[in-house]
């Protein structure tokens, strides 16, 4: 369908902790985030995937979201936040409860940064509670799970549909949501209430 996919395993990358675009400017010796950030900003679709740990998304996923947030000062050509006009989703997997809670947190975080979240923008697979095989381990049943396969398919198509809609229409309309205009003193049809 003409979609190129890049996979970035954050756990395998040297991503510094912090909320600045480049943490080497703030005391860290190494930080691969600036290069990763370029890939993220070049993408129309971002899917964050996380295991469940103690009912929450992983600390690595939290770090990625914090680093995305570190770029929230960036603006697009229309003066909106840089993540406007892009779509986001998430995938959660693990052997304990909390998939919907994790998805709720990840999707909220993405929309707060400016991503558009389509309907059914999450998918999850949960193995048997307790220590056990992971999704791709032999005998896990993960790849054969109809519920997970259906939700992953719907997630994928909804991301593609909304990304295409945004691309074809030039993104989110640039009126009433331009940080550059607000900073310049425009109040974008938001009249100060007259208290009487």
How should these model regions be labeled?
Residues 116, 134-139, 187:
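Short alpha-helix boundary/capping motifs
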Residues 14-19, 128-136:
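Short acidic/His/Gly/Ser-rich catalytic and metal-binding motifs that mark active-site loops
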Residues 4, 91, 129-134, 141:
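Compositionally biased, intrinsically disordered low-complexity regions
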Residues 1-78, 140-142, 146-196:
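N-terminal beta1-alpha1-beta2 submodule of the flavodoxin-like/Rossmannoid cofactor-binding fold
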Residues 77-131, 147-150:
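Short, glycine-/small-residue-rich phosphate/pyrophosphate-handling segment
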């Amino acid at each position: 369908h003409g979609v190129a996919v890049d996979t970035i395993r954050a756990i395998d990358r040297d991503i510094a902790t912090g909320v600045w675009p480049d943490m080497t400017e703030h005391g860290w010796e190494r930080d691969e985030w600036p290069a990763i950030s370029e890939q993220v900003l070049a993408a129309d679709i971002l899917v964050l995937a996380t295991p469940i740990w103690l009912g929450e998304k992983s600390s690595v996923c939290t770090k990625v979201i914090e680093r995305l947030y570190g770029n929230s000062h960036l603006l697009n050509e229309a003066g909106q936040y840089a993540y406007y006009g892009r779509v986001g989703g998430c995938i959660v997997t693990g052997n304990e409860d909390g998939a919907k809670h994790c998805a709720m947190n990840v999707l909220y975080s993405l929309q707060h940064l400016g991503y558009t979240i389509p309907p059914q923008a999450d998918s999850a697979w949960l193995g048997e509670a307790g220590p056990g095989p992971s999704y791709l381990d032999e005998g896990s049943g993960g790849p054969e799970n109809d519920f997970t396969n259906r939700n992953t398919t719907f997630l994928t198509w909804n991301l593609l549909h909304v990304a295409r809609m945004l691309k074809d229409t030039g993104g989110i309309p640039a009126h009433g949501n331009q940080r550059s205009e607000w900073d310049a003193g425009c109040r974008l049809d938001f009249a100060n209430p007259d208290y009487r």
